[in-house]
Curated annotation (Swiss-Prot):
Signal peptide stretch: 1-20
Keywords: Signal, Virulence
Gene: virB5
Keyword presence, Cell cycle: no
Region (Disordered), start-end ranges: 219-238
Induction: Specifically induced within macrophages by phagosome acidification. Induced at 37 degrees Celsius in minimal medium, suggesting that nutritional stress is a regulating signal.
Family: Belongs to the virb5 family.
Physiological role: The VirB system could be required for the establishment of the replication niche in the host.
Name of this protein: Type IV secretion system protein virB5
Note: Transcription of the operon is maximal in early exponential phase.
Native source species: Brucella suis biovar 1 (strain 1330)
Amino acid sequence: MKKIILSFAFALTVTSTAHAQLPVTDAGSIAQNLANHLEQMVKFAQQIEQLKQQFEEQKMQFDALTGYRGLGDILRDPTLRSYLPHNWRDLYEAVMSGGYLAAAGETANLLRKSQVYDPCASISDKDQRIACEAKVVKPVQDKVMTSKAYDATDKRLQEIESLMQEINKTGDPKAIAELQGRIESENAMIQNEDTRLHLYQQMAEAQDKLLDERQHELDAKDNARRGYPQPKALEAAY
């Protein structure tokens, strides 16, 4: 009897445990959880799209402030790089020693066009003739150099005006910055060439004095050859 009771109790225990392990399905709760999950996914997708838009806007702003627009060389005239020759001192020396033969290019052309009479042709002494020719060529050479300087500066100013017009046509900050940098570069080049022209003018004045002194020495030499009294000898006599 005791065994029967124990068996019945065990059977009840197993039955109760089996019933306790059966899952209970709540369809409403599952549907609500799924809806919440989908809503979160939609929000995540919207946030990702907003982040993409923000990234694109920041990239556009970055590109507007950086990068190369290729405007550093716009409207640049390479012939204006240096309108005064780098060897202009050598040109002066050549004129002093060669006279007409040293005149070349625009200087020679202008000399031929402007000269109505050659005051040096009748001079037989070679040194005297070359000194005479040098004094004839020198002002022509100065005019050519000064004209080049004026024309080049005028063209640079026209370039600057055109660059300023280009600035008014664009709203690109980087393009404007490049154009402004180019304008500053052109202004610096004008100042640099103006300094060179000033040095050239000083050299020209010094060259005039050298030509005058050379002519004075040649005259003294010719007077001595002819037996004429020298200026210093005359001063000493008085």
